[in-house]
Amino acid sequence: MDYNGVLVGLGNPGARYEGTRHNCGFALIDAFVDFGYRHGTVDEMNGGKFSCQLWRVRLPRLDGCWLAAKPQTFMNLSGQCVQPLLSWHKLKAADLVVAHDELDIPPGELRFKFGGGNAGHNGLKSITELLGTPDFYRLRMGIGRPPHKGDVTNWVLGRPQGEDAENLDHILPLALDVLFAFADKGLDSAVRLAGKTTRPRKPVRQTANAEASNNSPEASATPQNKDNT
């Protein structure tokens, strides 16, 4: 079967990471698949050979069929899912859209781009290394930076609260609109639409350490030989 593209949302597997900032890519896949069930056709596929959860989504707004994947590796091993997934389906890096959290974008805002650096994101780094190219599309979902330097790990692995959580929820339908704009009209349209997103309000943030202790026990603990950031 021919596919128009592949949407991969980055995150860490397991209940302990559900709802964390680092898993906003997973949240987008959930929203995309749910939209597909309501407005199109969705087939759940066997993604075991690619170490991912995998769906085939057909939507009129996509003018065809897309794959949607949630890697079940840890974040820094995301490429071990993406590279074989593309290879098996005879797709190129340029057919790939990766949705991921972005520290340098405020919560409630989006950016869309093709290629570029990884900005310290281990999931993007793994994908770039195993594909052998940075030339794929990125749907960047803003999570903002922590209020105190040095606690980035606790921040990305923490669960947002209050207005901060509302800001992150706010971008999910907007992110779908950006994806549909890209599928329908191409890169420039997606870039313009993403650039129009603004924070609905200034979030009041807890410290990352408080969030980690309140919402994600052991969230800062890195499993042996794994890197969840």
UniProtKB/Swiss-Prot annotation:
Residues 194-229 are annotated as: Disordered. Its main location: cytoplasm. The keyword Cytoplasm applies. PROSITE patterns: PEPT_TRNA_HYDROL_1, PEPT_TRNA_HYDROL_2. The record marks D101 as: Stabilizes the basic form of H active site to accept a proton. Residues 207-223 have a biased composition (Low complexity). It is found in: Cytoplasm. The record marks N12 as: Discriminates between blocked and unblocked aminoacyl-tRNA. Pfam families: Pept_tRNA_hydro (PF01195). This is Peptidyl-tRNA hydrolase. It comes from Desulfovibrio desulfuricans (strain ATCC 27774 / DSM 6949 / MB). The lineage of its organism: Bacteria, Pseudomonadati, Thermodesulfobacteriota, Desulfovibrionia, Desulfovibrionales. The gene is pth.
